[in-house]
């Protein structure tokens, strides 16, 4: 029996939608399987996505050459994706990275500054006085130093980027199947996907791109080897006037000596409810999940009170001029691979591949990561394109 499709992508998040677009641009017979965003998280019993949000930091500088290449190649295509889809998702407001000044035990700022020079990226290096003069709304610890990237950096809306990628995949001929995959198997010379809705779909090859939910016990013959952590993010509502006053605020990564108080923060962003929120994240410790059931239950919550209290304190220390705004929290998740890089490779079957384990830092790089996943299916391997890592996939015994 002939397969229903040439290639199926399982997962309609940032990586899956990107892979579907790149595949559909190059061949016919593409499908992407995954449910829509639930209307009510608290009562939803299915899977979730970490892209249900409006703010992720994007920047081109990274001390790691491979991560820098993934980011730069993705960012270079933002304008094309926005133009072709008609959906805007990128705000080039710049990105500021701060930490203890160079010369001490913490070398984070030094590594970022060196990476910027190596990559030829224009930056401003700011000491205490420079930080205060350029960003008066921030209050940093004495002895801080910052690397400011004014261009090619800022933030993206993951929700709108996924919408844009999905639209372009459909325009190129991909079929969107709004169902939830339960299992992927190599059967009789085909890759077969069975869904929770009771249907089966077959293809020459299948690419799994379901983020943290890829740890589901029966999804693959052997589950992927990665650690999945719950994260709590906190949102502070600001008025129109406050948002205007903070219009010069860049995306921020603040690194502290002991790392416990290290955070990331997004400037005021308008959310679907019409209000502006400043988002901050950076849990004080890890909350690991061993099963998909635990992960589903986590996404139905609003996160942890412990993390919220931690982030509220840091927010008021960093932005003292915003006086006790209303706030709320939400849950998210990140997945870490053994290698520290995305896993883009085949299972024991040459018909079933994975695109998972994005290490909490891949939203900005999702288009290039998705392209590499598409290349894996089309060419049978990732071609040598300047990456030092082989993006190898790991599986549990």
Positions of the model-derived regions?
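Core beta-strand elements of the Rossmann-like FAD/NAD(P) dinucleotide-binding domain
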Residues: 3-5, 196-205
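N-terminal Rossmann-like FAD-binding beta1-loop-alpha1 element of flavoenzymes
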Residues: 5-32
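Active-site substrate-recognition segment that forms the wall
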Residues: 21-25, 86-90, 200, 205, ...
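Glycine-rich FAD pyrophosphate-binding loop
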Residues: 25-50
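Dinucleotide-binding Rossmann-like beta1-alpha1 core, especially the glycine-rich loop
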Residues: 53-134, 262-263
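Flavin (FAD/FMN) cofactor-binding and adjacent substrate-gating region
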Residues: 80, 100-173, 177-178, 183-188
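Conserved beta-strand-loop-beta-strand element in the redox core of flavoprotein oxidoreductases
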Residues: 183-200
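C-terminal catalytic lobe of FAD-dependent flavoproteins
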Residues: 310-397
